[in-house]
Amino acid sequence: MICSNRAVWRTAGLAVGTATALLTAGPPARLAGQSTTPTIDTIIVVNRNVFDLQEADAPGFIARLANRLHARTRAGVIRGTLLVNPGDRYDSARVAESERALRNLNVFSRVRIDTTRLDGRLALRVATTDGWSTKPQIGYSSAGGDVTWLVGLVEDNLLGTATSFTAVYNKTPDRRTFDLGHVNPHFLSRHGWLQARYSNKSDGDRGTWLVGVPFYETAARRAFTTDGEAASERVLVFRDGDTSAIVERRALRVGIAAGFAPHATSAGYLRLWLAGQWRREDFAPEGTTVFPRSVFGTVGAGMDVGHVRFQVLERFNSYARREDVDVSQVLHVGVWAAPRAWGYPSGQAGVGPEVSGQLAAPWRRGFAVLWAAANGVLTGGVPDSGRVAGALTIASQNLRHQTLIVHAEGAALRRPKPGAEFDLWNSQNGPRVFGIHQFTGTRRVWLALEDRLLVADDLWGLMGVGVAPFLDYGGAWYADEPARLGGAVGMSLRIGPTRAVRGDVAEFAVGYRFGKGFSGSRWGLAIRKGVRY
């Protein structure tokens, strides 16, 4: 996808958030040997099927069958995603950003844009290789003896249009869920966006949607989106494994956001945004016959500043493909108003400031990224609710066939709404061989050290294989109880597809546990999706 939406944090009934997009490349550069910036005369699109049958390691019958069944991405989709056109001046930054935009469609396993000359005229050659996009879902994961399984179908490139459709049935120890989803990155226009999801749960229903035109590139000047939610569901609130605090939630929400960039280039931007939201959201104990009904309204405004930069790595979170790592310097500042006249009780009405930022230091084959964010609600000048969070990631590939990672993060909540508490089993940002809901609360920390060793980058032309010794330490707890921390040291086997549209890695981890958060044997096993840093 060509945009990213910042999470909308809601504390004590006040919604704080905004939608932004961060795409970039380096500064524009002239072609070697040219005294003036040349003009792009033509764009050549070369789109290959999933397998190149001329390659020595092409898996024979499987390769031929996959190529025959797969609907190749349409050339018009590729051209429509590019941020440059014939007749434009050559800009290396926009060309690099176009390459990232194609990767963000999540329909290709390989993307490369180069320049060439045809009869002395400058041409861009866009070479892509489709990934296998039709994925029957038969999944199984286990951590600390708690099992989750799923079955379904995901099509990430429906009829070669780069639109996705999802139908998945998922069973966890908590509930059964049937999910339907659809994403269209060119809805009604070249840069229009549509995203919709419906979840039919064994204990409720929930639907969400988003439509509009986001900041689809670094130099984009305008954005407008609208999103919403409708839900009638149970909210599970865990405290040391106990779910006696289960509540019912009913919600209907509609929001709009508009943005304008008074300064925007291929290297950075200054964006101003204005957003509003109308919401009905109520919570009540299970079995309530007369459900309460509340109506709220909020409005917010703010600013985003960014100097944008991406680093291209391989074998970081996947195998045999180029990955874009965001090493931008960004700052987000905003404030939301929730007046009594718009439905908030006197004890909850107020203002909600929010701020977040990222600093990064890249080097050849490595980087360090520091991120922090905070938001809250002030009523009568006194903090009523809020959230603070921060993370540091350091990664290095300076040793051959190794990715060394050090990651630390922490966060704290004040008076969160039901269901917004931390649950490290669901979010996968905690010790990885512990059972379901072992770490829940309003405080959390996590330290991870991992050395991802490459065994095979493209085994049999189908998958990458690696191993990773790891050390995890962290946990979650409530403010009125002692810190609940545990850890594990162990080894994981990592296997990921190399011909699929997404390179998500499956992880089989075995570890020796210590500290709190488990009972029984100190040895734990986890089979799940690999951690993405």
Question: Which residues does each PLM region occupy?
Answer:
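Periplasmic polypeptide-binding modules associated with outer-membrane biogenesis and secretion
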Residues: 3, 31-155, 166-170, 175-184, ...
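Outer-envelope beta-barrel architecture signal
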Residues: 39, 122, 132-134, 147, ...
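Transmembrane beta-strand segments that form the barrel wall of outer-membrane beta-barrel proteins
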Residues: 82, 113-115, 132-142, 149-172, ...
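C-terminal transmembrane beta-barrel domains of outer membrane proteins
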Residues: 82, 330-533
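Feature captures outer-membrane beta-barrel proteins of Gram-negative bacteria and organelles
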Residues: 149-158, 176-189, 207-219, 226, ...
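Outer-membrane beta-barrel translocator domains and adjoining extracellular loop/strand segments
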Residues: 151, 177-183, 206-212, 224-227, ...
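Transmembrane beta-barrel wall of Gram-negative outer-membrane proteins
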Residues: 183-287
